[in-house]
């Protein structure tokens, strides 16, 4: 995206409504999908951003907070059906009830640092995730901050395994 017009538009939106500004900012998830997802994922998820579907980045957890290397939400690959499944809890997720989420999850059994984490696309329409709690905030109510529970939630790997934190989240947050 051309950065100057984008930032100008974001500032104007922020003046009008802080909650909407949060939703606007999370559309950067589409940029991460554009840069790192495969062609099929791009065809499936990018047009949905233009149609108004909302996005979230599901990173923090009850025991990991901002220490993303400590993320424990598990991503398990099922050889039988060739799909990934997410299991665990995410907490303090801005816009947590979004249609599409980029989820940081531990894909490598036995790892305890950032090298065992991968990035996944989760589509709310596929089920397997429930919003357990919505934070009662003083303001910015237009963008719910949620606790999410994933139970055998189907997801798609973005890019390569083990690069979730060291490459994709760094790009997402930059």
Functional labels for PLM-detected ranges:
Residues 9, 38, 57, 75, ...:
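Buried hydrophobic positions in well-ordered alpha/beta secondary-structure cores of metabolic enzymes
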């Amino acid at each position: 995206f051309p950065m100057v017009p984008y930032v100008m538009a974001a500032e104007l939106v922020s003046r009008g409504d802080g909650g909407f500004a949060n939703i606007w900012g999370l559309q950067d998830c589409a940029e991460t999908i554009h840069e790192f997802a495969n062609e099929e994922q791009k065809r499936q998820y990018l047009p949905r951003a233009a149609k108004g579907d909302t996005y979230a980045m599901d990173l923090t957890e009850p025991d990991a907070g901002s220490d993303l290397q400590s993320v424990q939400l598990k991503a398990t690959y099922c050889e039988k059906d060739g799909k990934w499944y997410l299991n665990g809890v995410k907490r303090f997720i801005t816009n947590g009830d979004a249609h599409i989420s980029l989820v940081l999850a531990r894909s490598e059994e036995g790892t305890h640092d950032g090298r065992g984490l991968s990035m996944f696309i989760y589509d709310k329409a596929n089920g397997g995730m429930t919003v357990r709690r919505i934070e009662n905030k003083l303001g910015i109510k237009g963008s719910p901050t949620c606790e999410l529970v994933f139970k055998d939630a189907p997801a798609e790997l973005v890019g390569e395994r083990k690069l979730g934190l060291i490459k994709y989240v760094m790009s997402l947050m930059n």
